[in-house]
Curated annotation (Swiss-Prot):
Pfam families linked: Caveolin (PF01146)
Protein name: Caveolin-2
PTM annotation (Phosphoserine): residues: 20, 23, 36
Keywords for the protein's UniProt record, in alphabetical order: Cell membrane, Cytoplasm, Golgi apparatus, Membrane, Nucleus, Phosphoprotein
Membrane association type: Peripheral membrane protein
Length: 162
């Protein structure tokens, strides 16, 4: 607990004179914040979650709201997204991390101590099972299929047009 040291990656500049028909949102330079701490998503698992206001809300050229409405909506969207994410992570991150840790530990234990020994045992036993299965197939199934094949080979079919 202490002072918040993270920097925001979005800045809103609300100058009334510079707004025309665009949103006026100027994103901060990504290189500026690249070395501001550790990369929390080094494998880019959640790169699809980088949504901006324009990805969610879009007004076609023919139907524009007032510039002030657009600016306020944009600001409220960004602020509410930021605040709600922080609020939810305060209450959910630690319990969900604990549950995920228990789940992954359980699955790892089951995989290491139950599943892999079972698979290795099956792979050791399979050559002898394969030999027995081949013998059963040669003794019972092959003669049956051969006799059925010979029976059907003597059947002839002739079509005539009347």
């Amino acid at each position: 607990m202490g002072l918040e040291t993270e920097k925001a990656d979005v800045q809103l500049f609300m100058d009334d004179d510079s707004y025309s028909h665009h949103s006026g949102l100027e994103y901060a330079d990504p290189e500026k914040f690249a070395d501001s701490g550790q990369d929390r998503d080094p494998h880019r698992l959640n790169s699809h979650l980088k949504l901006g206001f324009e990805d969610v809300i879009a007004e076609p050229v023919t139907t524009h709201s007032f510039d002030k409405v657009w600016i306020c909506s944009h600001a409220l969207f960004e602020i509410s997204k930021y605040v709600m994410y922080k609020f939810l992570t305060v209450f959910l991150a630690i319990p969900l991390a604990f549950i995920a840790g228990i789940l992954f530990a359980t699955l790892s234990c089951l995989h290491i101590w139950i599943l892999m020994p079972f698979v290795k045992t099956c792979l050791m036993v399979l050559p002898s099972v394969q030999t027995i299965w081949k013998s059963v197939t040669d003794v019972f199934i092959a003669p049956l299929c051969t006799s059925i094949g010979r029976s059907f080979s003597s059947v002839s079919l002739q079509l005539s047009q009347d």
